[in-house]
Amino acid sequence: MAEKKNILTYEGLKQLEDELQDLKVNKRKEVSQKIKEAREQGDLSENAEYDAAKDEQRDIEARIEEIDKILKNAEVVVEDEVDVDTVNIGCLVRILDMEFNDELEYKIVGSTEANSLKGKISNESPVGKALIGARKDDVIEIEINGNSFKYKVLEIQKSN
């Protein structure tokens, strides 16, 4: 079975590439230095600094492997080419919460780069799934954990 594609915006791709570069060039050196300094302290069997540095090294290598895997299976959305007649990945969408009369704005992204605190929601999230394919003035209804939410699509635009 083919691996699932990791859908990324160009911004998300660039962030991952930058993080990978930092991990490989800077973080690896830093943790190697910490391990070297901890070794110089002598007995490694009761050396908390050594254990912490080795744990950090494992975390760094695991993150490098994770990013490599994401990038290997990446499908980049060209945001300039996104159709804004309907909500798609890469769009910026402004919606109205019909219960509270609040306007919300989200960028629809792939699950890898979703971050609700930054207004980026995944196309696989309940709200993202319901919004994909919606048009301006459409009302969508979502049920999450037994609660019903209604949103009206106010505007769809390119995110850049």
UniProtKB/Swiss-Prot annotation:
Question: Record's PROSITE patterns?
Answer: GREAB_1, GREAB_2
Stretch list, region Disordered: 36-55
GO MF, one term, reads: DNA binding
Tell me if DNA-binding is a UniProt keyword of this record.
Answer: yes
Keyword DNA-binding included in the entry's annotation: yes
> Which chain positions lie within coiled-coil regions?
2-81
List the Pfam families hit by this protein, alphabetically. Answer: GreA_GreB, GreA_GreB_N
GO BP field? DNA-templated transcription elongation; regulation of DNA-templated transcription elongation
Alphabetized, the UniProt keywords read: Coiled coil, DNA-binding, Transcription, Transcription regulation
Q: Relate the protein's function as given in its record.
A: Necessary for efficient RNA polymerase transcription elongation past template-encoded arresting sites. The arresting sites in DNA have the property of trapping a certain fraction of elongating RNA polymerases that pass through, resulting in locked ternary complexes. Cleavage of the nascent transcript by cleavage factors such as GreA or GreB allows the resumption of elongation from the new 3'terminus. GreA releases sequences of 2 to 3 nucleotides.
Concerning its family, UniProt says: Belongs to the GreA/GreB family.
Protein known as: Transcription elongation factor GreA
Give the source species: Lachnoclostridium phytofermentans (strain ATCC 700394 / DSM 18823 / ISDg) (Clostridium phytofermentans)
Q: What is the lineage of its organism?
A: Bacteria, Bacillati, Bacillota, Clostridia, Lachnospirales
